[in-house]
Design a protein with these regions (language model features):
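Hydrophobic ligand-binding cavity/cleft-lining segments
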Residues: 1-39
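Charge-dense, helix-prone N-terminal extensions
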Residues: 2-4, 49, 58, 94
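Short, surface-exposed coil-to-beta transition loops
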Residues: 7, 56-60, 82-87
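Generic structural detector for well-ordered beta-strands
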Residues: 10-12, 48, 62, 89
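Hydrophobic pocket/interface hotspot
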Residues: 20-21, 30, 45-47, 63, ...
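Glycine-rich portal/gate segments that line the openings of hydrophobic small-molecule binding cavities
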Residues: 32-78
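Beta-strand/loop substructures that line and gate deep hydrophobic ligand-binding cavities in soluble
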Residues: 75-128
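Short, highly charged C-terminal tails/helix-capping segments
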Residues: 130-132
Length: 132
């Protein structure tokens, strides 16, 4: 049984490609909305959720594709298979002139609701902390 694909598209309240690109492709940007802490060493990303001195989760991932001001594709190091990645893609809306953020991720059938909820929370944090 294969994982199911989750695709979420949100319009961002920004027409600034450099600001959005920084938020989706750098450790400092991702730390503002996707995890409590993100560090980068080369193509390796380390995500930390929670506080290190208490309950927390740490996952590492590798950037496998990155096209500036377009998309970043990241694979989880603790998973195998063709569906072990997430992708963050930015596209400019020709109607509003703002950018759209498209998130592609994968989960097992029984984890789809949870994954959707995680990304919805992440997007709310992106809007609340960064104003976009």
């Amino acid at each position: 049984m294969d994982k199911q694909r989750l695709c979420i598209e949100r319009e961002l309240i920004s027409s600034s490609a450099p600001i959005i690109w920084d938020l989706i492709s750098t450790d400092a940007g991702l730390s503002r909305w996707m995890a409590d802490s993100v560090t980068q060493e080369g193509e390796q990303l380390t995500f930390v959720w929670g506080e290190l001195w208490s309950h927390h989760e740490v996952r590492t991932a590798t950037i496998v594709e990155k096209v500036k001001n377009q998309y970043i594709k990241v694979t989880w190091d603790d998973e195998d298979g063709p569906d072990n990645f997430f992708e963050l893609r930015m596209d400019k809306s020709h109607i509003t002139n703002d950018y759209m953020l498209t998130i592609t991720d994968f989960a097992w059938d029984d984890e789809m609701d949870s994954l959707h909820s995680i990304w919805t929370d992440n997007l709310a944090r992106l809007r609340n902390t960064c104003g976009i």
